[in-house]
């Protein structure tokens, strides 16, 4: 395991955006597989590989690059002098009141578009319930993330937690 961590760290140092994006693609796909197999209990024969591919595509080409840039922006621009707790809370507020509502909309719109479905209908039906569910999970996760996790590992940490969240999003999106 330590050789994998050394290798991953070297990739993060050499190509941070690419490494974060590929990692995100893999973990978004993992979330969808989890949704299909553990939540929906589809079995291997009925597994929707195209759906898993859409999740990987979105994770790698949209969410990975955007979230990598977002975490760097927060670290660079949202700072409170001499008050780490206030800084963490400010970052969580920016994340949950700005980034999360937009990115849930981007996710649902992207999925609807890739599926050939109505974006408006998808947003109208699922955006608000998904955002409320987000607020039940992600503020606490982001407090931990912004308090304890070094910047280069924040997306990875969020993506590990997001396996469950992406399972939920994949399931909500498929309803």
Curated annotation (Swiss-Prot):
Similarity annotation: Belongs to the peroxisomal membrane protein PXMP2/4 family.
Phylogenetic lineage: Eukaryota, Fungi, Dikarya, Ascomycota, Pezizomycotina
Protein name in UniProt: Protein SYM1
Record keywords, A-Z: Membrane, Mitochondrion, Mitochondrion inner membrane, Transmembrane, Transmembrane helix
InterPro entries, sorted: Mpv17_PMP22
Membrane topology: Multi-pass membrane protein
Pfam families: Mpv17_PMP22
Organism annotation: Gibberella zeae (strain ATCC MYA-4620 / CBS 123657 / FGSC 9075 / NRRL 31084 / PH-1) (Wheat head blight fungus)
Subcellular location: Mitochondrion inner membrane
Transmembrane regions: 55-75, 92-112, 143-163
């Amino acid at each position: 395991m330590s050789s994998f961590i050394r290798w991953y760290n070297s990739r993060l140092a050499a190509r941070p955006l690419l490494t974060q994006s590929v990692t995100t693609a893999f973990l978004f796909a993992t979330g969808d597989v989890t949704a299909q197999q553990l939540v929906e209990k589809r079995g291997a024969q009925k597994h929707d590989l195209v759906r898993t591919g859409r999740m990987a595509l979105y994770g790698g080409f949209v969410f990975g690059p955007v979230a990598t840039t977002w975490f760097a922006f927060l670290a660079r621009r949202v700072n409170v002098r001499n008050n780490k707790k206030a800084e963490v809370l400010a970052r969580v507020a920016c994340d949950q009141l700005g980034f999360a509502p937009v990115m849930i909309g981007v996710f649902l719109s992207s999925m609807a578009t890739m599926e050939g479905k109505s974006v408006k209908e998808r947003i109208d039906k699922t955006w608000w319930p998904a955002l409320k569910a987000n607020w039940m999970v992600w503020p606490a996760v982001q407090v931990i993330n912004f308090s304890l996790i070094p910047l280069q590992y924040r997306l990875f940490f969020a993506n590990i937690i997001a396996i469950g969240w992406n399972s939920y999003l994949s399931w909500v999106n498929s309803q």
